[in-house]
Amino acid sequence: MLDIKLIRKAPEECEIRLRKKDPNISLLPILDLDKEVRRLKTDSESLQSQRKLLSTQIHKAKAQGEDASNMISEVERISQDLEKLEASLEEKNATLQDLLVRLPNYPEEDVPVCPDKSGNQVIKSVGALPTFSFTPKHHVELNQKLQILDFKLPAKTSGSGWPAYKNQGVMLEWALLTYLLNKQREHGFQLWLPPLLVKREILFGSGQIPKFDGQYYCVEDGDQSLYLIPTAEVVLNGFHSQEIFNEKDLPIYYAACTPCFRREAGAAGANERGLVRVHQFNKVEMFAFTTPEQADQAYEKMLAVVEDILTELKLPYRLSLLSTGDMSFTASKTIDAEVWLPGQQSYYEVSSISQCTDFQSRRSETRYKDSQGKMHFIHTLNGSGLATPRLFVAILENNQQKDGSVVIPEVLRPYLGNQEVLLPQE
């Protein structure tokens, strides 16, 4: 959520910045409503002051045995006017807040301006793309012999986009998740296994709604609806909603391992079948609470974790600075880490590291007190560390052998009883 005071102070500048994300944004309706709301508040305060003064005079008149009927009638009239005014104020303020919460975060100055992902800028590439003496297979084709995934049986129970891991695939997935959590711990992150269901206001606080309302799985729990998390970012941000930190306790780094649930798996082409786009997947998520001055260092820390992991897994990857049209609603800046998938002959995102400034904390009312006792909204950052489906695919496709076997990355072998190769089962 944006600061209305800044919008009032520099409306043209704010609108220019916001239009980098959405060229259709106009702040005029917000500014007009804001003026009306402030006028109504002033009128309300004036009427309340008049009523209070008259009430004092009525009390004195009665104490002195004087007639106060005219003043009593005036108080009744003011009360009726005040009731109507406050109803109008409540309605207009609700409309104003609804418009405000639909505005995205401002992009940083160094973010490329483009309406779509074609404007993303590759800022770093690491590792040579693998060469094969044979035609490399898509992971779905590799699976025909490896038998580590199943797409048909879960389609019977849950529909398309809900794959199941089996046999050696289960062990590889858990090895990967355990390895990822250990890396987070090495880098100083507090580990969490948080709830998978959250209240609606927690989704609001992280910026998922109202803009993306209807895109999340909902569970009815009596009179309350709970939502399956699309990412652990939601619940980690929500842990400290309406709380006040002391500056000396910041920064705070969290990492959570959870399944993630998304209704839109995306339109999958022929190459994007299998694990590339799914409704449920496992992910280790990083999250940080910082002061504005600590945010850049936290951003570099998260990026370093991701690069450390991809380097140890010996996967070719690149970092892309996302354009304004490809960034998330909440982010002011995002760098994607993308791994090379030979089966798709393309790079695919496995991590997004985002700065969110005070956008989420204003919605969640998360603040900190500085050494002088002054209150500030906290800054938040998040990043995947990492999402496993495409990482799983990258391991299979980049390390495949001619006979259909897959060489297990060395760093994962200790979690698999020092097993070196996934062997075909046929």
UniProtKB/Swiss-Prot annotation:
Pathway: Aminoacyl-tRNA biosynthesis; selenocysteinyl-tRNA(Sec) biosynthesis; L-seryl-tRNA(Sec) from L-serine and tRNA(Sec): step 1/1
Taxonomic lineage of the native organism: Bacteria, Pseudomonadati, Chlamydiota, Chlamydiia, Chlamydiales
GO cellular component term of the entry, any: cytoplasm
Known role: Catalyzes the attachment of serine to tRNA(Ser). Is also able to aminoacylate tRNA(Sec) with serine, to form the misacylated tRNA L-seryl-tRNA(Sec), which will be further converted into selenocysteinyl-tRNA(Sec).
Family affiliation: Belongs to the class-II aminoacyl-tRNA synthetase family. Type-1 seryl-tRNA synthetase subfamily.
Gene: serS
Pfam family, one: tRNA-synt_2b
SUPFAM superfamilies: Class II aaRS and biotin synthetases, tRNA-binding arm
Reaction equation(s) it catalyzes: tRNA(Ser) + L-serine + ATP = L-seryl-tRNA(Ser) + AMP + diphosphate + H(+); tRNA(Sec) + L-serine + ATP = L-seryl-tRNA(Sec) + AMP + diphosphate + H(+)
Protein name (database record): Serine--tRNA ligase
Subunit composition and interactions: Homodimer. The tRNA molecule binds across the dimer.
InterPro entries: aa-tRNA-synt_IIb (IPR002314), aa-tRNA-synth_II (IPR006195), aa-tRNA-synth_II/BPL/LPL (IPR045864), Ser-tRNA-ligase_type_1 (IPR002317), Ser-tRNA-synth_1_N (IPR015866), SerRS_1_N_sf (IPR042103), SerRS_core (IPR033729), tRNA-bd_arm (IPR010978)
